[in-house]
Each structure stands twice: as structure tokens, then as C-alpha cells.
């Protein structure tokens, strides 16, 4: 068993209270602006010096128990009264050291010292119990306030609710506290309702969350943007997109400006429900209501149209992006090209591939593979070779499947067989299907590039002679 050392606190405090100079013993300065540079003199009858010095000594201790012993020793001295900050510092130290049984003793001393109990000390209590992940202790702090004849403030209620709903199994206790808080003189505010609505939505209890929203209005608690956003997300999560749209209309009619996340949630839900007309109308409506669509909103709409084989409508969305000053990214182009290929519009897809590369984006190998496969299926060898050449010139990756389609088109039978064997070895060596030819064989990339150019030249000459 390890024994704690016995400290000579009298010696410690004699050192602590040694004169700073022959003429400035116990001299400190207040920090308030109206008393700037006005000296504060500790009680000269106190043998251990000023409360400020004791506070600093307590704060400097890494051992919470030693800090508590210093606190207790100072408390026993005649004519000494701890500062309020000393109590707060000690509560934090004891809480973080998990000496929770000693905290009540500090509270009792704080009360007996004549200090009025303020919300700050209970805020500290909630903080230490929350950090220790002790929801029961957090909940008990509410009743501890009442025990000390202190009426909790809405911020205390909200912090307690926030902690409780973040722990599995404590939602019902949070709800009971919420319902009883009015009986104790604590009026829940918008934040209180939002915390519980969010928790019930995540717990798949949308009906309770919506009832809470109704109670807000009955009790003249004004909802905010977050209140609507929470419910919109809850309705969309349950697939009730029409209910979510009604909330949006109510929100707009009351003068609220929905945030971007609310619009993103609605657009996603409308697209998944294949209500593309409504989704596009919402996209156009955003700008009129003070929220310019961003990249996420446009990409959501492009994906929605492409999923329903409406690539030309998706192309219109891309054009809208540009006209509204929002630049497409690689996801925008990749989604659109994929949608065009799915509908057999390979020439259109090739144009957007070239535009994509010209803007500095690197096409995923699936994009070039989709285009090459499509052109080859229609016997458009030159167009397929064009795609390969454009991608290679940009130093991008081609999938091995793409090469297997292209090589027979540009090489004779003997060359094709040799290159095919080489590719098989290369893919085995690299253990990947997207290996670049230029990385696995000296000169092979240049060789195939020259073959592509020759193939295209021959195709042009044949067309000229027809």
C-alpha cells in the first residue's frame, strides 16, 4: 500500500506569504477596468496570505488530492475565505481525477462560506460529469440545484438534455426531465425542443418529434431554422417527402431561409422517389429564396436524371451550373458521361470527356472504358481510338479491359497475340486492373500510340476513296 506523504502546509504557506519586497507585502492589483491599478490588500490577520495566492497554489497542483488538502488547510485558518474561483478550480480537478465523492464536500464548504450559489458552479459540475460519461450524475445535478434552492436556467436544462440524449437508454429520462422542468420553474426554450426532436427522429420516433413541434407553437416557443431542418430530415428519412415539402413551404411562408443541408436532403429524397420534376423546380426555386444552389445540389440533380435515363435533362443541369457561376467537378462529368453512355449517346459522352480533360480533371478509367466499349459495339473504331489517344496523351490510366478491346483493332494477329501475353504478365505483376501501359513496358506505350495514329490515318484515307 502506497502511503501519501505528509506535507508541512504551514511551511508551504510561510514560503508562499514571504514578502515580495519590504514595502509591498500582500499587494495585488484588481483586473476590473474601473478599479485599474487599485491595490487589493489581503487581510493582514490571515497567516497564509491572500485568497489569490492560495488559488494559484491549488491551480498549480497536478494531484487533485493534494489540491484538496491545501484547500482544506486554508479553510481552517482564521480570517481566511477562499475565492469563488478556488472552488471552481478544485471541482474541475476532483472531477477530472474521478474523485466525485469529494465534490459534495467542496459544495458544502462553498455554501457555508457565505458565497451565493451561482449557475457557474453547477455548469462546472455538469461539465465534469459529462466528461466522465456519467449521465446519472449529470441528471442528479438538476435536482442538486433545487436542493441548494437554486432555480436551474434553460442553459443548464439544455446541457443536461444534450448529455442524456447522447447516451443510449437515456432518451426517456431526458423526456421526463423536459416535461417536469416547467413544474420547477424552468421554461424550455427552442434549443430544448430541438434537442429532443433530433433525438426522437434519430430513434425512429418521428410522431413524437412532430408532436413536440406542435407543442412549441402552442406554448409560444418560436421554432428556428434548426427546428424545421430536424423535422425535414426526419420526414425524408422515413420516405415521407411530401410531408417534408409541406414543412419547407411553412418555413418559407414564415420568413425563414432554409439552409443548404435542408435543400440537399429534400433534393435527394425527391430524386430517390423519382419526383424529378418537383426536384428540378425546387432547384430553380432555391435561388429565388436566397440560397444559391451549390455543387452538391447540382450533382444530386444530375445523378437523379441519369438514374432515370434522362441524360439530356442532366446535360441541361450541367449547363445551368455554368450559367449560374458554379463550376462542375469530376463527379459532375463522370455521372453525366455514364448517363449518356447508358442511353447510347457515345458521341455526346466523348465531347464531355474532352471538355472534362480540357478543364484539368482526370477521368476515372471506367469513363474511358465505357466510351470505348460503346464505340466498339457499334463498329466505330476510329472514335474508340480517339478516346484512347486523348486519355493517353493526358497521362491517364486505361483499364486492362479497355486495352483488350482496342489492341485487336489496331494490330495484326501476331502483334495482338504478343501484346496480349505481355499485358497478362504485366497485370499479374502489378496485381491491378488499371495498370498504365507506359508504366510496365519500355516503349510499348509509344508503340501503341503510333499504331492508333496509323489506324486513324488509314480510316480517313479509306473514307476519302469511297
Swiss-Prot record:
Belongs to the PPR family. P subfamily. This is Pentatricopeptide repeat-containing protein At4g01400, mitochondrial. InterPro entries: Pentatricopeptide_rpt, TPR-like_helical_dom_sf. It comes from Arabidopsis thaliana (Mouse-ear cress). It comes from the Eukaryota. It is found in: Mitochondrion. GO terms for cellular component: cytosol; mitochondrion. Keywords: Mitochondrion, Repeat, Transit peptide. Pfam families: PPR, PPR_1, PPR_2. The keyword Membrane does not apply. PANTHER family: PENTACOTRIPEPTIDE-REPEAT REGION OF PRORP DOMAIN-CONTAINING PROTEIN (PTHR47936:SF3), PPR_LONG DOMAIN-CONTAINING PROTEIN (PTHR47936). GO terms for biological process: Group II intron splicing; mitochondrial respiratory chain complex I assembly; mitochondrial RNA processing. Residues 1-34 form a transit peptide.
Amino acid at each position: 500500500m502506497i502511503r501519501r506523504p505528509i506535507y508541512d502546509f504551514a511551511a508551504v504557506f510561510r514560503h508562499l506569504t514571504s514578502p515580495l519586497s519590504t514595502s509591498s507585502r500582500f499587494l495585488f492589483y484588481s483586473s476590473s477596468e474601473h478599479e485599474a491599478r487599485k491595490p487589493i490588500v489581503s487581510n493582514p490577520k490571515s497567516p497564509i496570505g491572500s485568497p489569490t495566492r492560495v488559488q494559484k497554489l491549488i491551480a498549480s497542483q497536478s494531484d487533485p488530492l493534494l489540491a484538496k488538502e491545501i484547500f482544506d488547510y486554508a479553510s481552517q485558518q482564521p480570517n481566511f475565505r477562499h475565492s469563488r474561483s478556488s472552488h471552481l478550480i478544485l471541482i474541475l480537478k476532483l472531477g477530472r481525477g474521478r474523485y466525485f465523492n469529494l465534490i459534495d464536500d467542496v459544495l458544502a464548504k462553498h455554501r457555508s462560506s457565505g458565497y451565493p450559489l451561482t449557475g457557474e458552479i453547477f455548469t462546472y459540475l455538469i461539465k465534469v460529469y459529462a466528461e466522465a460519461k456519467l449521465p446519472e450524475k449529470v441528471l442528479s445535478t438538476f435536482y442538486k440545484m433545487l436542493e441548494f434552492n437554486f432555480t436551474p436556467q434553460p442553459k443548464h436544462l439544455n446541457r443536461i438534455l444534450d448529455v442524456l440524449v447522447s447516451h443510449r437508454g437515456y432518451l426517456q429520462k431526458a423526456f421526463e426531465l423536459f416535461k417536469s422542468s416547467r413544474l420547477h420553474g424552468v421554461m424550455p426554450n427552442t434549443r430544448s425542443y430541438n434537442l429532443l426532436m433530433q433525438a426522437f427522429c434519430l430513434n425512429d420516433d418521428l410522431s413524437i418529434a412532430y408532436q413536440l413541434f406542435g407543442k412549441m407553437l402552442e406554448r409560444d416557443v418560436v421554432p428556428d431554422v434548426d427546428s424545421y431542418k430536424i423535422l425535414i430530415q426526419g420526414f425524408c428519412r422515413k420516405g415521407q417527402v411530401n410531408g417534408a415539402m409541406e414543412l419547407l413551404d411553412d418555413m418559407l411562408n414564415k420568413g425563414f431561409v432554409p439552409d443548404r443541408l435542408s435543400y440537399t436532403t429534400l433534393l435527394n429524397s425527391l430524386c430517390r422517389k423519382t419526383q424529378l420534376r418537383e426536384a428540378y423546380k425546387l432547384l430553380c426555386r432555391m435561388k429565388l429564396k436566397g440560397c444559391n444552389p451549390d455543387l452538391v445540389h447540382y450533382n444530386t440533380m444530375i445523378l437523379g436524371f441519369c438514374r432515370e435515363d434522362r441524360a439530356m435533362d442532366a446535360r441541361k443541369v450541367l449547363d445551368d451550373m455554368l450559367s449560374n457561376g458554379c463550376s462542375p467537378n469530376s463527379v459532375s462529368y463522370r455521372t453525366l458521361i455514364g448517363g449518356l453512355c447508358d442511353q447510347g449517346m457515345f458521341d455526346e459522352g466523348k465531347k464531355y470527356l474532352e471538355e472534362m480533360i480540357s478543364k484539368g480533371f482526370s477521368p476515372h478509367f471506367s469513363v474511358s472504358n465505357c466510351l470505348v466499349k460503346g464505340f466498339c459495339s457499334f463498329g466505330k473504331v476510329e472514335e474508340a481510338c480517339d478516346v484512347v489517344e486523348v486519355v493517353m496523351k493526358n497521362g491517364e490510366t486505361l483499364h486492362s479491359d479497355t486495352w483488350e478491346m482496342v489492341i485487336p483493332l489496331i494490330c495484326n494477329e501476331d502483334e495482338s497475340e504478343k501484346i496480349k501475353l505481355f499485358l497478362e504478365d504485366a497485370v499479374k505483376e502489378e496485381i491491378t486492373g488499371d495498370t498504365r501501359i507506359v508504366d510496365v513496358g519500355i516503349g510499348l506505350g509509344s508503340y501503341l500510340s503510333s499504331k492508333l495514329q496509323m489506324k486513324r490515318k488509314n480510316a480517313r484515307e479509306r473514307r476519302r476513296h469511297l
